[in-house]
Amino acid sequence: MWALCSLLRSAAGRTMSQGRTISQAPARRERPRKDPLRHLRTREKRGPSGCSGGPNTVYLQVVAAGSRDSGAALYVFSEFNRYLFNCGEGVQRLMQEHKLKVARLDNIFLTRMHWSNVGGLSGMILTLKETGLPKCVLSGPPQLEKYLEAIKIFSGPLKGIELAVRPHSAPEYEDETMTVYQIPIHSEQRRGKHQPWQSPERPLSRLSPERSSDSESNENEPHLPHGVSQRRGVRDSSLVVAFICKLHLKRGNFLVLKAKEMGLPVGTAAIAPIIAAVKDGKSITHEGREILAEELCTPPDPGAAFVVVECPDESFIQPICENATFQRYQGKADAPVALVVHMAPASVLVDSRYQQWMERFGPDTQHLVLNENCASVHNLRSHKIQTQLNLIHPDIFPLLTSFRCKKEGPTLSVPMVQGECLLKYQLRPRREWQRDAIITCNPEEFIVEALQLPNFQQSVQEYRRSAQDGPAPAEKRSQYPEIIFLGTGSAIPMKIRNVSATLVNISPDTSLLLDCGEGTFGQLCRHYGDQVDRVLGTLAAVFVSHLHADHHTGLPSILLQRERALASLGKPLHPLLVVAPNQLKAWLQQYHNQCQEVLHHISMIPAKCLQEGAEISSPAVERLISSLLRTCDLEEFQTCLVRHCKHAFGCALVHTSGWKVVYSGDTMPCEALVRMGKDATLLIHEATLEDGLEEEAVEKTHSTTSQAISVGMRMNAEFIMLNHFSQRYAKVPLFSPNFSEKVGVAFDHMKVCFGDFPTMPKLIPPLKALFAGDIEEMEERREKRELRQVRAALLSRELAGGLEDGEPQQKRAHTEEPQAKKVRAQ
């Protein structure tokens, strides 16, 4: 049996290696349309919105509390609907980790078009599309519509999901849970000026492209894909949108026991009209006696309101204080506001005008603050696994830290609570704070858990003895370059592995990034803590391998936070060198036009200009390439096309001291990469899938672990680090027999120097002990998969073996049918 399994794997490997030899990736098969989600079927059965009254349970929950590494995001739950307020980078990862179901989101509200609010939106929409959600309503500033169009630059047409955009000019939104009113607020600098472009709600699929007066473009200004508007937008940083959300009335609960005591026909068909009447507040007559509705029903809940408001800086304070819509909800008994959520920095909260505005809501209104004074840990699983890995090798797996704001939060005269990850405020059935879900990070518990695992301590001790007893290195290698793996997972951010990003510290004062997926800045914050500004100050360049969301959507955050870091360090802002496919510029151009100015942050080098023998497109690009080599002390920065999507590149960095680092990006085994990376010191190669999944690897244009190792061997690389693992291998990939003393496995926040190469293979036994349970589960899944393959192969062989060559197909099927049935019966 196992011999046949090995035969199947090797045959699959031969098929893959002998197949396509060109760099163009194979076309992907269209995925079948998913069945409607269960909650959507339930909603259809329930009938029109509001017909059964408001929901029984409603609460708000903090997803991200506003810290520098996570932004501010709020999740609202009812049994009918789910809502998300703001969707910055890392929000999807937090929702996945803390089991807040993304597939149930049917409304996303955005307070302004700032990257801290929308940085995770593209990835979230792609995930919603994959889950089969048919429609999502997005509300916020008018530029939101064009921002969503820009996603198609790298995602292609968003088929299968309708994105209905509601700008702030649209009427109020109403569903089964609540009515939402959008309140546009313009800063004092913006008041009195012409209102920006607006559009009514309509699906993006119906938007038609508009022609631009600047229709000509050169190599560095590529044409946008069909369906993406080329028109210059109206960037309006002076606009924020607040939301007033009013819960629907919830009818009282029918008191069954009380009804029985009164002799009502409980349990019969006659009780239905009685229940309907008393829930509507009507009295009934039973056996000549009038029964009031309040005798049979609990009091109805008229439905409180909550407010979500962002005040980015002091220029918005006066417009907020003077807003007439807010005034109608301040201190009014007929329009009680249970909670106001403030997304505001400390400089706003200490302003006396803003404090007076908060006080006008009255003493019964609670206030939740989300800003950088938050000290909450968000990514608990990442902290846990890093603490346990640190027991194996403290230098290679350093402990995580977090960015802490040095300013103390203000003291306020209103009931104010500082946000924490997973903090809840319940609106129904009763109003109260709920802190039981709040994350507590206890490293001691993580350590005890690891030490209690079978064979873990023994494996660590054996590794340390072997490290001490081993031969001393012939030469002590420099600390630099230092490789920091910030994201080692593929496709979407998950609780343990974030998406692609690798920091290469070339020297103490120079670094570059290899890819920059969503959440890269957050990973830097958790790795470096208060030193993150210093690290951003050393960043000289970013290489973006291709335009898939898990490789480039973290770039705007890096650009904006780098500007802040340089200012805090007292350094002038200068453009960051970005090596990428031309299409990246088109996406950044769209964001620049609609949301924030970012283009002055970058100097773009088209990745194709760094291919061997390529012509430099212009003298300006030639100067940028010279600057890149000089700044990073490189002899050469070369790219090559790899076998993934269109315009996908790998790269090779050759330092003046002689070392060579090669990065594959996403690719199937690629001869061009082998040639470019010849005699590399280090190859960082994607290994998305395990051995035995070669067919899936071809379909998804990725590599298996053994394929990645084979590329490194043919390249004659000194060492191979495997990277970009499918999220099905969240903790550790399956180790294959091809792992040797030249192969290591990357983890998020792993720090590797060239001198660590001999150590890396020795870490595998302790890693196997730490993740023994996960490895056992993966091996069981593999065995079941291989057993299915064996059965399919045997059945195919039996059917084929009973057929004689040259006979007509129908005759063969007729004559051999009894024999085939006999074989199956056996």
From Swiss-Prot:
Effect of residue 217 to L: In HPC2; risk factor for disease development; does not affect the enzymatic activity
Impact reported for residue 622 to V: In HPC2; higher frequency in prostate cancer cases
E.C. designation(s): 3.1.26.11
Region (Disordered): 16-51, 188-231, 798-826
A molecular-function term among this protein's GO annotations: 3'-tRNA processing endoribonuclease activity
Entry keyword set: Disease variant, Endonuclease, Hydrolase, Metal-binding, Mitochondrion, Mitochondrion nucleoid, Nuclease, Nucleus, Phosphoprotein, Primary mitochondrial disease, Proto-oncogene, Transit peptide, tRNA processing, Zinc
Tissue-wise expression: Widely expressed. Highly expressed in heart, placenta, liver, skeletal muscle, kidney, pancreas, testis and ovary. Weakly expressed in brain, lung, spleen, thymus, prostate, small intestine, colon and leukocytes.
Keyword Protein biosynthesis on entry: no
Major subcellular location class: mitochondrion
Record keyword Nuclease present: yes
Cofactor: Zn(2+)
Entries under InterPro entries matching the protein: Metallo-B-lactamas, RibonucZ/Hydroxyglut_hydro, RNZ2-like, tRNase_Z_dom
Chain intervals with Basic and acidic residues compositional bias: 27-38, 208-224, 808-820
Transit peptide: 1-16
Biological process, per Gene Ontology: mitochondrial tRNA 3'-end processing; mitochondrial tRNA processing; tRNA 3'-end processing; tRNA decay
GO annotations of cellular component type: cytosol; mitochondrial matrix; mitochondrial nucleoid; mitochondrion; nucleoplasm; nucleus
Chain positions with Phosphoserine modification: 199, 208, 212, 229, 618, 736
Coiled-coil regions listed: none
Enzyme class, spelled out: hydrolase
Function: Zinc phosphodiesterase, which displays mitochondrial tRNA 3'-processing endonuclease activity. Involved in tRNA maturation, by removing a 3'-trailer from precursor tRNA. Associates with mitochondrial DNA complexes at the nucleoids to initiate RNA processing and ribosome assembly.
Subunit organization: Homodimer. Interacts with PTCD1.
Family, as annotated: Belongs to the RNase Z family.
Protein name: Zinc phosphodiesterase ELAC protein 2
Organism: Homo sapiens (Human)
Name of the gene: ELAC2
